[in-house]
Amino acid sequence: MSDTIYVGATYRGRVKVYNREVSPAALVAPDTLVITVSPPGGGADSTYSLAAGTLTTLAAGDYTFGHVCTIAGVHEVESVSVIGVRVGVGQDDFTVIARNV
């Protein structure tokens, strides 16, 4: 896919993964999204698995500019690079916008 992948979060550390073409409601179990977060400059990767359309708890600081994420489980492995973080009220509501690389 060449579509933008949006990793949306509401409240710190609660992340929901979805994209424009395949909404969470359209995904049927057991479709599972596997998210691997690689910190910039090296360090240990963090891996999370969640059923499509669900929320999961991520470690603080995982989604910051420069982190590289790998998302798999819908159609194919998607390698994405975080290109921006939009912070909302109280810096607890935020949206991570990623795209394929």
Regions found by a protein language model. Give the residues of each.
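Contiguous segments within soluble domain cores/interaction surfaces
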Residues: 1-101
